Amino acid sequence: MSNGLPISIGRPCTHDSQRSLSAPNSRIHSGFNSLLDTDLPMVHSEGTSTPTQLLRHPNIWFGNLPPPPRRPQDNRDFSPLHPLVFPGHHSQLRHVHETQQVQQTCPGKLKLSGAEELPPAPQRQHSLPLHITRPSRFPHHFHARRPDVLPSVPDHGPVLAETKPRTSVRQPRSATRGPSFRPILLPKVVHVHDDPPHSSLRPRGSRSRQLQPTVRRPLLAPNQFHSPRQPPPLSDDPGILGPRPLAPNSTRDPPPRPITPGPSNTHGLRPLSVLPRASPRRGLLPNPRRHRTSTGHIPPTTTSRPTGPPSRLQRPVHLYQSSPHTPNFRPSSIRKDALLQTGPRLGHLECLGQPANLRTSERSPPTKRRLPRSSEPNRLPKPLPEATLAPSYRHRRSYPFLPNPPAALPSIAYTSSRGKIHHSLPKGALPKEGAPPPPRRLPSPAPHPQLPLRDLGRTPGFPTPPKTPTRTPESRITASPTDIAPLDSDPVLSVRTEVHAPERRTFMDPEALRSALASLPSPPRSVGIIHTAPQTVLPANPPSPTRHLPPTSPPWILQSPVGEDAIVDSEDDSISSFYSHDFDSPSGPLRSQSPSRFRLYLRSPSTSSGIEPWSPASYDYGSAPDTD
């Protein structure tokens, strides 16, 4: 038929498509027609072949085939045991054919590989070409469920064959229809590599290895007439860092003596020992399995008693050349007492330079301050040079430089409970009575160079007075603390009260001031610097309240910022620094650089002139609180 392929024996059906069965002849049995009309669908919707459904029908059973299972299966699960053709002895299905064109298998595609022919001459023998693959064991296999897919054949790579021998059987010249005779080759070892070196998809397998027998070497007999030189054992090797120090009360092994060849004894035989040489120490057994290492660091065992006296825990100490038992100590930098040993590392001065073998009981107890105390008493700080002094307002003290003890004061001076020193002046050093003129301020020029107080007599404005003042019994007058001017918390308010007080006299004769300053005792140290700046006008004679005279001489203002940068000890009240000297001027209050002042008050023994007993001729210390 042109459009169909009659189903017969030996013709495989390789394509499944929708098919329908028809009975063109009336010779088909009517019972089979009833089966086809009622139970067998002619066109399957899922594309299942009709013969497959016919074979799986439970009511149709062919003689040689087993009955199919009754469970339903899809088109991809049919068993390969059922062929796609009907048996030939059933004549009723002989003329059943397909109505659609079926894709046939090309007979030229399945071409069997022919017999491999060898070259005619043995001189042209070579290895197998790479395009010839090893034939599979079953070349005609089809896939069980997909017949158009061939099974995968593992590729083992090229076969490396050795050179074939010259004695080979030739094939006949003409090809015959019979089976081809392969050449008979001698058995040779062919190394076949199952897995290629660059394949990552192949399972790894052990490569074939050839086992080579070990070469037996003859045993050499030891020479009886020559003793071999044995190398020194490793235990005697000091190593890079030298021999390890020994524990106390231990002795070092004697050094190995060089082997000296003795008299040749041809008859005596030296036995060869398999075990290593025994250790000279007691209580240590050699281990033949362990590699021989240095044993110099191993202390002696507990079985060996030390020769020295029994001691407690062995602690390392320093090594000294003068020590009589130098080999019994281990060189180390750790002292016997670990707590006292931390002193030099922390910078304690008392722990430096002491021997290491000093016992704890012999060591002096450490002080609290960890600083050495000198036997000399504390000295006053030396005055710094003038170039190093700078105006600093950080440390100001109102405590005076009082002599210690206070009994060292001169007879004309006395101290009060508030820290003031009062000096009694002679009777002639009193100012004249007069009314204070109104204040008059003038622009102050640049100050003169500062000079210390000890050079007071050398200044141009002050001639050098005699150093031995006259003292009268009447000048030695003591006053109670109640006569002292009260202290005010506000220095400005205190100055204002001093200005408006009518009983305070601020006029002073320069000659009387010079004599008063000359009668004062010299201070214990340089305490001041003199500023001679004409800020106000001081008349020569006390004028009337309505007259104004030109200035004749400037007032003497003593300002001495001494000891500003000196170190002040807070524990000693007798050592302090005061800032300046100040004298009241007739022009009113002068604002100084620091509220800490001491003033000069004059006291006259007679009060008949109507002047207040206290005049500005006494030192006033501590008139302001601390500014620290």
Swiss-Prot record:
InterPro entries registered for this protein in UniProt: 45/70kDa_tymovirus
Record's keyword terms, sorted: Host-virus interaction, Inhibition of host innate immune response by virus, Suppressor of RNA silencing, Viral immunoevasion
Region span, Disordered: 1-25, 141-332, 347-398, 418-507, 535-628
A Pfam entry, by short name: Tymo_45kd_70kd
Coiled coil (UniProt feature): none
Low complexity bias (residue ranges): 299-312
Bias kind Pro residues: ranges: 434-450
Biased composition (Basic and acidic residues): 497-507
Record keyword Glycoprotein present: no
One of the protein's GO biological processes: symbiont-mediated suppression of host innate immune response
Superkingdom, natural source: Viruses
Biased composition (Polar residues): 320-331
Role of this protein: Acts as a suppressor of RNA-mediated gene silencing, also known as post-transcriptional gene silencing (PTGS), a mechanism of plant viral defense that limits the accumulation of viral RNAs.
Family: Belongs to the tymoviridae protein p69 family.
Protein's name according to its UniProt entry: 69 kDa protein
Annotated organism of origin: Turnip yellow mosaic virus (isolate TYMC)
